[in-house]
């Protein structure tokens, strides 16, 4: 047991030489694709999401981030539901703190995202489209596993919760109880991160 703890401690101390230094630039991001069937009789809902981000290390191991999120979701018509599509574009800022843990890095962070949604639904006899705006606070953590020098695979977890009220034309005349943004999302993602040091 003592040998195992000593080896783990030695790896943690040795890995501290791989800290990300002030001035490092970090482009990266994640891509995801999911297909979901709400029940066995419905057509699948297809969702594609891309989330690029750029970070700048304002001090050793502390990154300030700019985030972009684009998501598309769609479902084709079936006997039980109409055809619809939804797209979402989000812009945000955030930060992450990194800690060396051999052979890679663990991190934790926080971000603030402003999203703009638009949707279109086709049904017998017509078409409906609409949209809304919303704000979100996200907590995230993960592990960066090194692939080659300065390139890491990002295994992450994220929890996102809604802030404030929904905005947009569809919500101007809505009752107050329908305006509250009480959404919450938990996700697992994988991505690629690159680090360019000065």
Could you say what each language-model-derived stretch is?
Residues 38-43:
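Hydrophobic transmembrane alpha-helices
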Residues 162:
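Short, solvent-exposed beta-strand-terminating loops
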């Amino acid at each position: 047991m003592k040998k195992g703890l000593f080896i783990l401690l030695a790896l943690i101390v040795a890995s501290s030489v791989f800290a990300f230094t002030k001035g490092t630039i970090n482009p990266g991001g994640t891509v995801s694709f999911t297909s979901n069937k709400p029940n066995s009789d419905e057509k699948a809902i297809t969702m594609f999401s891309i989330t690029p981000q750029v970070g700048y290390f304002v001090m050793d191991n502390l990154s300030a981030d700019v985030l972009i999120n684009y998501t598309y979701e769609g479902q084709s018509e079936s006997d039980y539901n109409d055809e619809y599509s939804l797209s979402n574009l989000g812009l945000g800022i955030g930060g992450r703190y990194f800690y060396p843990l051999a052979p890679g890095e663990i991190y934790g962070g926080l971000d603030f995202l402003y999203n703009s949604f638009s949707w279109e639904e086709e049904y017998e006899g017509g078409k409906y489209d609409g949209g809304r705006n919303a704000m979100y606070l996200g907590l995230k953590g993960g592990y960066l596993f090194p692939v080659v020098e300065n390139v890491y695979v990002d295994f992450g977890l994220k929890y996102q919760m809604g802030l404030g009220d929904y905005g947009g034309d569809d919500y101007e005349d809505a009752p107050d109880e329908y305006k509250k943004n009480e959404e919450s999302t938990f996700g697992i993602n994988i991505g690629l991160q690159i680090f360019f040091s000065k």
